[in-house]
Amino acid sequence: YEDFKSKPHAVRQWLFTPNPPMLPSLSVDAACSGSPGPLEYRGVNTETGEQVFRAGPFPGGTNNIGEFLAIVRGMEWLARNKLDWVIYADSDTAVAWIRARKCNTKLARTASNAMLFQLIARAEESLKNFRSFRIMKWDTKAWGENPADFGRK
């Protein structure tokens, strides 16, 4: 109970900073146990902490792939719900891949991670439908952990 009770306070420490994140917004994050390893990702409403999507675990992934997929899924979710929100992510690599509209992973394709590569191909195709998007870096130093963080560090 104590862990649960203290989480919302810790997650929302950014409310009291001089330059808090923009609201409303969507925060995305990924978790990967090892590299490669089991990968999952999710998106949450930054303000409320409500989880709006979650996927995985998928075997044989990397954190950057998860972040890339989470951003694209977030863009799709915002478009489907006709919302013009900022997306916060904490992976510079994934954001660069989004801007290039290409997941530039060096991960070798294997039988165990074939599903991930199917998701990557679908995400890259989906990116062709987005003319503009607002993705910003989550400022962990100023705001604490991203609200979508899985808390496994």
Features from the language model and the residues they span:
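Short glycine- and acidic-rich boundary segments immediately preceding or forming the N-terminal edge
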Residues: 1-18
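A broad, low-specificity signal for short, low-complexity segments enriched in glycine/proline
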Residues: 3-6, 47-48, 96
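Short amphipathic alpha-helical surface micro-motifs
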Residues: 7-10, 23-26, 115-120
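RNase H-like nuclease fold core
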Residues: 13-65, 76-77
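RNase H catalytic domain
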Residues: 32-35, 75-151
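Short, charged/polar low-complexity linear motifs in solvent-exposed/disordered segments
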Residues: 52, 70-72, 113-114
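Short, charged, low-complexity patches
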Residues: 63-68, 116
